[in-house]
Design a protein with these regions (language model features):
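Short beta-strand->loop micro-motif that forms the acidic, two-metal-ion catalytic signature
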Residues: 61-65
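Catalytic core of pol beta-like nucleotidyltransferases
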Residues: 1-39, 51-56, 67-127
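Short gly/ser-rich loop at a beta-strand->alpha-helix junction or flexible surface loop bordering the NTP-binding
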Residues: 41-49
Length: 127
């Protein structure tokens, strides 16, 4: 359900409807695929949007698991930040895209609380 309201500065703030979220996730997946190609392993939606308890101030948390060494991921951060900004403006939301190397995620997914939370509450995005 799309929620609209005006704050004290008469600035419109909104959250994304289910249809808008699906479109945003498809477009995010496609954009990440264009950056990483076959090295993009999985994309996960996690946090309040995955749990369904988001509000108008919530950001949209996304984790991209990439089959590259973590040292190489640094080269892609600017490009991913730019695509995130483009999608922020298009959908009038705040995306928070975390790049994560697949090896570290797999190695620590049973021990690190953050990774456990992504696995427990997250939703895997499929193209």
């Amino acid at each position: 359900m799309e929620m609209l309201y005006n704050d004290s500065k008469e600035r419109q703030v909104r959250s994304v409807s289910n249809l808008g979220l699906n479109n945003l996730m498809k477009e995010t997946y496609s954009a990440l695929s264009s950056v990483f190609g076959e090295k993009l392993d999985e994309v996960w939606l996690y946090g309040s949007y995955a749990r369904g308890d988001f509000d108008a101030e919530s950001d949209i948390d996304i984790m991209a698991l990439v089959d590259l060494p973590k040292e190489q991921l640094a080269m892609y951060r600017r490009k991913v930040s730019d695509l995130s900004s483009d999608l922020d403006l298009k959908y009038d939301v705040l995306l928070s895209i975390k790049l994560q190397d697949k090896d570290t995620f797999l190695r620590f997914s049973n021990t690190l609380p953050f990774f456990q939370n992504v696995m427990k509450e997250g939703k895997r995005v499929v193209q």
